[in-house]
Amino acid sequence: HNIDLHAVSGQGGGAAATFTAPGHETQFSFTALNAGLYIYHCATAPVGMHIANGMYGLILVEPKEGLPKVDKEFYVCQGDFYTKGTYGEAGLQQFDMDKALKEQPDYVVFNGKVGSLTGDKSMKVKVGETVRLFVGNGGPNLVSSFHVIGDIFDNVYVEGGSLVNHNVQTTLV
């Protein structure tokens, strides 16, 4: 496998440099030129299937001067899974290409797992605390109209870049 780091400029986002054969290891480095929040994912064909199996994540490139201090930070990454098993079936689930092509996921998850941000695992903050959310979407198919019930985002960095929208109720991720 290999990875496509959307924070890396150049062909394949580092895919050629990160290709690693079974039983081997690979290292590479890069200079991040642009601050922002970026997706990375497996770049080995079929890419969509590997993404749909959870081979993605977020990489944050902070500006040289750093980010303003906040009380809490959270990372949230959405993904969708398409399985041949029945909903809730335990164990390894085989990928269902037909469901993926129809964009009919069995699971839409945050941080790779059903219920990862609910109950005892929910994000907890106190009134008056400043919070920074890093929100991404690994896909491979669905988007999210992301919002927090009962609040408005002071600042939204559109698509993880440097354009800032203020006082946002819902943002597309």
Locations of regions flagged by a protein language model:
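Copper-binding active sites and cupredoxin-like electron-transfer domains
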Residues: H1-V173
